[in-house]
Amino acid sequence: NTIISVSGNFDDTFFELLEKYFGTKKMLDTKPYLPDAPYISKNNIVKEKDIEQVQLVATFKGIDVMDESVYSLLVFNNVFGSGMSSRLFQNIREQRGLVYSISAGHSAYINTGVFDISAGMSPESLGEVAHLISKEINTIKRNKLTSAEITKAKEQLKGNYILSSESTGARMQGAGRSLLLNKPIYTQEEALKKIDAVNADSVAEIIDRVLDSSTMCISA
């Protein structure tokens, strides 16, 4: 099955070409095979190599692509680990200079998701960095986010979304991906309202869901 997404300056001729080359194609009456989401129990893996750097990643079970709490997750991670103003970057790299890089991010799939925290450092810093990451996780779970942090994160996300929407390529990809996953295609106004709807309770809930120590795996 094929989905064609178009954005930008086009006219009826384009639709005529689509109809000419794709209009006679019949949709297959089949459903894609969707295996159960894999689950790996809590695990720690350390592999030693004779190299000058250490790469550390801590992963947690995330949310799938259909989960509307993604907006709360984006707000949470904007504060926690996304970008140079995040807590992870400021407290571990900027203030202490213990890592070359550090960030957190989320990857969503059709039936599961992965939230990861990754960092690169010298071998002698591994223990302290792991301790500080754990400390940041415990701090944000215990104290949650302030209303000022949530407001600032929402404004940053809305600004980034508006800027990205100026690209016809980004709009094309977003619409195509939504159609492929049977998700609604939101207008810019609708998407901004989704971000605005995020509140302290929804952020606290997603923090507890994602930063669940029972699903954490660490590899270095």
Could you tell me what each predicted segment is?
Residues N1-T30, D64, G81, E94-A220:
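Charge-rich, well-structured scaffold segments of protease-associated domains
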Residues T30-R87, K194:
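His/Glu-based metal-binding/catalytic segments typifying zinc-dependent metallopeptidases
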Residues R87-Q95:
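Short amphipathic alpha-helix segments
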